[in-house]
Structures are given as structure tokens and as C-alpha cells.
UniProtKB/Swiss-Prot annotation:
EC number(s) stated in the UniProt entry for this protein: 3.4.24.39
Active-site residues, Swiss-Prot/TrEMBL: 309
Keyword terms: Cleavage on pair of basic residues, Disulfide bond, Hydrolase, Metal-binding, Metalloprotease, Protease, Secreted, Signal, Zinc, Zymogen
GO annotation terms (biological process): proteolysis
Name by which UniProt lists this protein: Neutral protease 2 homolog BDBG_03102
Family the entry assigns: Belongs to the peptidase M35 family.
Catalyses which reaction(s): Preferential cleavage of bonds with hydrophobic residues in P1'. Also 3-Asn-|-Gln-4 and 8-Gly-|-Ser-9 bonds in insulin B chain
Disulfide bonds listed in the record: 188-259, 266-284
Length: 357
């Protein structure tokens, strides 16, 4: 999928546009988090997070792409000398329905759970020195004993300062590099290869359609991106245009796309994942249980899942998106700034454009 077209001009536009879209002093109605996250240093770059339900209602919290996830996902942001250290782990797209009970943690009011993880595993801290670690975002929830995501809660942590031993951190980061150098698949064959190739191929016209709809603005755009501002519309359209270019070829481009999981990341609840630092995308077995294109508004399918993953990779359009919220209800609760940085906002908007939702 290596595209011959340079995206330097787009990158420059994106950086400038994102910086000007939302004032840094923007306030949200939900500034008080339902989940409190207490970060403490265990040893070296090993960190403990204690997640507590601050509210007065029971919560059933999804652990995928959150604390307690065993995959190398982004749980915290790491800052060095005032700048965020690039995240080098994986970004997962998981199911929004049919989820297994074991991926949820139930928290009653005042109850907590703990998680320990090494921040040097997914961030290059080899330069050493003082870093600041913090977490803020949204966690997906479902009704108690449910298997379909139905809500979202805001979480926020304290700021944790750590003095890092660069040599020790480099060894931890090297373990991720070793993890990422396992034998790769040489290609896509059989029914899965055909399904993936078709989905990638059809991602191109759908992304182009979404780009046109974004430029025109309207109800669906405002629903997902919380504004009809022309600058924001152009920025969203530019990312969709880049996805359309990347998906237009399965033999050249800026990303490497695998039909199956070469790194052992997949689980029954994960559809696909991206390794943005290497511009790698991989489907999971659950991807192939999806329909090619759904006829259900806000639903998941193979084509929009591929679009979701393409938006993560900075080789397609920089900066790549994050995973801030999953599903229609959570994605439409985001601010403009957050939606511009949320992969599911793009895939759900493409679904809305295709079906006229």
C-alpha cells in the first residue's frame, strides 16, 4: 500500500489546523471524572494504577484498551521535557456487541481494581531523566451482565513524576522491538485473503464518499464532530482522502496490512489492530465474522473496520488517530478536538454517510 504521493503538505495542514480547532482552555461539562485513577511508582518504570468508582452507581467497565488489558495498549500518556513521548504500542478495534464477560470488571460505588504495567515497554525512554505520567479519557461501559457497549465514563489520574534510568528503560523498550520482530505472514491467501482484499478495495470509494460528505458538512458531520466549521470539515476530509488513496492499492502504499495476526495480539473480542509506529495493520479472526458492509446504522463491518485502522497509521495521515471512545453513544459525546483524534468517529461517520443515518 505504498503510495507514491507525498503527504507532507497534508501533514503541515493537519498540524496547523488541529492546533487551531479548539482553544486549549475548552471546558467540558463532565470535568469531574466518574473514575479516579491513582498512579504510583512500583519500581523503575513499573507503575501501579488503582481505578476507583467515584460515583453512586454500579459500573461494568470494559478492560479492552484500558487498565487490565494485557496487550501493549496505551494506558497512560508519558511526557518528557514538556513533550509527549510517542506511543509505540498497539491500537485495537474491539467488538461493540457480543463481548465476552471476562473483558469487563464490575465496580460498585467506592470499589477499586488495580493494574501494573511498565511505561517503558510502549515508550522509548532511553534518554532517561524525569518524566511525567498521567491518564485521562473515557472508558466504555455496559449494563450489568450485558455484552453490548451502552455508555461511557470519564476517568482522570494524578500526575506521577519518575526519574528514569535510561539504560534500564532501553532494555524494556527493546523487549517490545523483539516482540515486533516475530515472523510476519508473507501474504493473504484463501477465503480470508479474498475477504480482506475486497474490504480494503471497497474502503477506498467509501472513504472518498465520506471525504465529500465531510466537505459539504451537515447533520451527520455535526453529530460526530460537534461543529460545521469549514476548517474542521476540510481536515476530516483530508484524512478520508488519504485513506482512500492508501486503500486504492493492495500492492503499494505506506502501510503493511496482514490478513492474520503475526504478533499474537488478537483475542476473541478484538477485530483488528494497528501498530502505528511501524505503520502495520492486522486483522483478527473476529474480523471475518463481520459482514462486508453492514446495513445497520452505527454497526461494525469489515470495510469500516479497515477504515478505522487506516486512520491510526501516521504513514497514511499524520498524526494518526487514537482510541478515545467506541461506539455511537461514546463517540458522539466527544468534543471536536477529541473526535478529530478518535478513530471510531471516522469509521462511524463513514457508516452514517453510506447508510444515510
Amino acid at each position: 500500500m505504498r503510495s507514491p504521493q507525498s503527504i507532507l503538505a497534508i501533514v503541515a495542514f493537519a498540524t496547523t489546523a488541529i492546533a487551531g480547532v479548539v482553544p486549549s482552555t475548552e471546558k467540558r461539562a463532565d470535568d469531574i471524572p466518574e473514575l479516579d485513577v491513582k498512579l504510583t511508582q512500583v519500581e523503575g518504570t513499573l507503575v501501579k494504577a488503582v481505578v476507583t468508582n467515584n460515583g453512586d452507581e454500579d459500573l461494568n467497565i470494559l478492560n479492552l484498551n484500558f487498565f487490565k488489558d494485557t496487550a501493549p495498549v496505551k494506558k497512560v500518556s508519558v511526557y518528557s521535557q514538556g513533550a509527549e513521548v510517542p506511543f509505540a504500542g498497539v491500537r485495537l478495534r474491539h467488538k461493540t456487541s457480543g463481548l465476552s464477560p471476562e473483558v469487563f470488571t464490575h465496580l460498585g460505588p467506592g470499589e477499586s481494581f488495580e493494574d501494573e504495567f511498565d511505561v517503558a515497554f510502549t515508550a522509548d525512554l532511553s534518554q532517561g531523566g524525569r518524566i511525567v505520567v498521567k491518564a485521562e479519557g473515557f472508558a466504555s461501559t455496559t449494563d450489568t451482565d450485558g455484552d453490548t457497549l451502552s455508555g461511557v465514563v470519564h476517568y482522570k489520574s494524578n500526575e506521577l513524576e519518575i526519574d528514569v534510568d535510561g539504560k534500564a528503560a532501553a532494555k524494556n523498550f527493546a523487549s517490545l522491538n523483539q516482540f515486533s520482530k516475530r515472523t510476519r505472514l508473507t501474504g493473504c491467501t484463501g477465503s480470508r485473503g479474498s475477504a480482506a482484499t475486497r474490504a480494503i478495495r471497497d474502503s477506498a470509494p467509501l472513504a472518498a464518499m465520506a471525504a465529500g460528505a465531510a466537505r459539504n458538512g451537515g447533520r451527520a458531520f455535526t453529530q460526530y464532530f460537534k461543529t460545521n466549521d469549514q476548517q474542521v470539515r476540510n481536515l476530516v476530509a483530508a484524512r478520508f482522502d488519504a485513506v482512500a488513496r492508501e486503500a486504492s492499492s493492495t500492492t503499494s502504499g505506506r502501510t503493511t496490512y496482514y490478513c492474520d495476526d503475526p504478533y499474537g495480539i488478537c483475542s476473541p473480542n478484538v477485530l483488528a489492530y494497528a501498530l502505528p509506529s511501524r505503520n502495520i495493520i492486522s486483522n483478527c479472526p473476529a474480523y471475518y465474522s463481520l459482514s462486508h458492509l453492514t446495513w445497520r446504522c452505527h454497526g461494525q463491518d469489515r470495510v469500516t473496520t479497515s477504515i478505522h485502522e487506516f486512520t491510526h497509521t501516521p504513514g497514511v495521515f499524520s498524526p494518526g488517530t487514537d482510541d478515545l471512545a467506541y461506539g455511537h453513544q461514546a463517540a458522539t459525546s466527544l468534543s471536536t478536538w477529541e473526535a478529530l483524534n478518535n478513530a471510531d468517529s471516522f469509521s462511524l461517520f463513514a457508516n452514517a454517510v453510506y447508510l444515510g443515518c
